[in-house]
Amino acid sequence: MKAHTGKDWFWYQMGPQERSKARDLIHFSHWPQCEKWFENNHHVNFLRVDTTETENEAVFGSIVYDQGLGEEKDHTVFHFYITRQYFFTINFDFSILREIKGKEVVRQMERADNAIEGFLILLGELMNAYLIGVDEFEVKLRKLRWQIKDDNSKSILNRVHLLRHELMIWKNLILSAKKIEMALKETFLPQNEGKKDYQRTQLKIDRGFTYISEFEGELNNLLHSEEVITSHRGNEIVKALTIFTTLFTPITALGALWGMNFSVMPELNWKYGYLFSLLLIVTSTVLIYLYLRKKGWTGDMLQERKKKKKPRKRRTL
């Protein structure tokens, strides 16, 4: 167990094997509500507040603070218990967070006035790691945006779905941070609402949700565009098959007549029977094609220019 000291408050950072020490830190008045949560170490995204006694409030729970993209079970949970004088965490590991230096965060936390503000700094650093991940997601989205311009294959549609899945994971992680921030505000604020660290954490969470909302809208637009293109291609295939079947109706009908074995077949003695039949097939096929073309049933539903526009040169001052 690591004990970090602030201004009249403490943070006890514990490993998963130190639950017995954490049990001793839970106030006896909070234990009736904490017992079910504490005894079950398999809780995921559990959050409760205890405001029964004034000046002795507490927020406790468990959240997933790291989630892999491949498997649902590939996640890391940390547990926390927060009061006005101290808080403890179980299984919180700075090394999991992207580009976050634990020692610098601890030094920043030690300057906090109370335990609530200290935990808000920790929550803010958690959001910093999430925002870094969201920035990396934006790079992937930008690449996909330009790939769709030149390639509308099935693999692109699959990539859109994969990015939507990744975005949902980031959204859920940020939502967990938002839930804790709201619980702290409900339990201990407004005394910390004007503090800069609380405001910074709140703004980071709002920034994360703004990014997520914008990316969701763009992915939905990309998915809708891909669905329209897929539907159009399906319609083109059905239309082509229909036209193909219609154009070959004359030769099919004539072939069916030739296949009949009636006793009287006058065309057997015609000198130019084959020539006449071929002319009849070609003429009827052309007439049917001209009729379909006149109705506009053979043209593309979406006219595509084969010639690509040359990119405009940027003007330089």
From Swiss-Prot:
Organism for this UniProt entry: Bacillus subtilis (strain 168)
Q: Tell me the classification of the organism that encodes this protein.
A: Bacteria, Bacillati, Bacillota, Bacilli, Bacillales
Q: What is this protein called?
A: Magnesium transport protein CorA
Q: Where is this site: Essential for ion permeation?
A: 235
Tell me if Cell membrane is a UniProt keyword of this record: yes
Q: How does it assemble?
A: Homopentamer. In the absence of Mg(2+), interactions between subunits are weakened, and dimers, trimers and tetramers can be observed in vitro. Homotetramer.
So what family is this one in? Answer: Belongs to the CorA metal ion transporter (MIT) (TC 1.A.35) family.
List the membrane topology term(s): Multi-pass membrane protein
Per the record, where is site Important for closing the ion permeation pathway in the closed state? Answer: 241
Report the domain remarks.
The central ion permeation pathway is formed by the first transmembrane domain from each of the five subunits. Mg(2+) binding strengthens interactions between subunits and leads to the formation of a symmetrical homopentamer surrounding a closed ion permeation pathway. Low Mg(2+) concentrations trigger both a conformation change within each subunit and a loosening of the interactions between subunits. This results in an open ion conduction pathway. In addition, this results in a less symmetrical shape of the whole complex.
Q: Listed GO cellular component terms?
A: plasma membrane
Probable selectivity filter (motif): residue ranges = 259-261
Example of a GO MF term: magnesium ion transmembrane transporter activity
